[in-house]
Amino acid sequence: MLCLCLYVPIAGEAQTEFQYFESKGLPTELKSIFKLSVFIPSQEFSTYRQWKQKIVQAGDKDLDGQLDFEEFVHYLQDHEKKLRLVFKSLDKKNDGRIDAQEIMQSLRDLGVKISEQQAEKILKSMDKNGTMTIDWNEWRDYHLLHPVENIPEIILYWKHSTIFDVGENLTVPDEFTVEERQTGMWWRHLVAGGGAGAVSRTCTAPLDRLKVLMQVHASRSNNMCIIGGFTQMIREGGAKSLWRGNGINVLKIAPESAIKFMAYEQMKRLVGSDQETLRIHERLVAGSLAGAIAQSSIYPMEVLKTRMALRKTGQYSGMLDCAKRILAKEGVAAFYKGYIPNMLGIIPYAGIDLAVYETLKNTWLQRYAVNSADPGVFVLLACGTISSTCGQLASYPLALVRTRMQAQASIEGAPEVTMSSLFKQILRTEGAFGLYRGLAPNFMKVIPAVSISYVVYENLKITLGVQSR
């Protein structure tokens, strides 16, 4: 009888032995998979129960809450294949061994920066013979009964632009794991993200419309506060007027997200290296180019959104009527007013948002990622809120100028202006503060927008058959 024994060291306790299962025979082709004793490092799983739960979740095919011999063997076979792929991706020199520099480079490619000392610490935990390199056998023995591959897990749990929608779709698109792309889960994530964005934008639409009104109409002579702005909107058009412009704002989510995703996949091939996952600067370049392509494609909808938000009661019967009147009165060029400041705003927004998010992600991973790369709800929401706020703060003057240019014809008698002349005019008449009109309601909507989009995203994932966190 062959008995597989698992020794699980628990910090502060004597080494405990657990007999997992017994079998009278083991197929010859599977003998290479097993070791009679497997040691699971205490820093990976602090308790046997936590370790067992992860193994059972990964291998339980019939969902009976238990792992029989056949399921366990299938889990080991499948997991070893995944480990082989990860090992090959880490082995940059193709010499059959992984050293500290290769670990640092692989994590750097994912945007996770660690020191050489940290890389050596990782090596020592797996290195059995003291060579400070890891061969395939050492890698397999260490990770075989660890149900998570850390590199894809980081991509899986730390999605950003797919989850969070604050109304400005200028963020760098998320990466998807190989498994997500092969199984078609990527489009489910995008659909869930689109639905979450629609609900989030609808819930925060009153604040978004107030922001647009303050960007266009507020000045030193017309000091518009938040309460006064809401009162003015309700007095002019009733409570329903708070949602003016929301229809087109929601409608543009689907085409923009689809174009952006497809463009990003193409840009990755142009700017990327041979690595499966892009480096941070490559992601920024590919994401910014994809964002520019998507924005160029749907920009007329951006102009319509601004005009619809600024309209007075009875001015337009709907979106199509608004578009027809703009076309008849101002021509096709009117649908691209503010295009240049909008394009220029992509780099600071996407760059700072990505940089801040990656910095916060790396800090958390280095300090707290022991058992899993899953940061939990509150950490993810906090990182998303902070990075989005920083990105908006950096690009806000350009966004304000874009909105004023889009709104030119909606203000009767307003002269035709360029981006540079509008900047000069604002600085001359209102000072630097004038470039940040409407910032308060814009920031007020970030936390509810992020929270609502996250909750809706998680629920839509379950509905669409995507495993929740």
From Swiss-Prot:
SUPFAM superfamilies recorded: EF-hand (SSF47473), Mitochondrial carrier (SSF103506)
Tissue: Mainly present in the liver and the skeletal muscle (at protein level).
Membrane topology, record value: Multi-pass membrane protein
Keywords: Antiport, Calcium, Membrane, Metal-binding, Mitochondrion, Mitochondrion inner membrane, Repeat, Transmembrane, Transmembrane helix, Transport
Keyword Transmembrane helix on entry: yes
Region (C-terminal transmembrane transporter domain): 166-469
Family: Belongs to the mitochondrial carrier (TC 2.A.29) family.
Protein name (Swiss-Prot/TrEMBL): Mitochondrial adenyl nucleotide antiporter SLC25A25
UniProt organism field: Rattus norvegicus
Lineage, top ranks: Eukaryota, Metazoa, Chordata, Craniata, Vertebrata
Gene name for this UniProt entry: Slc25a25
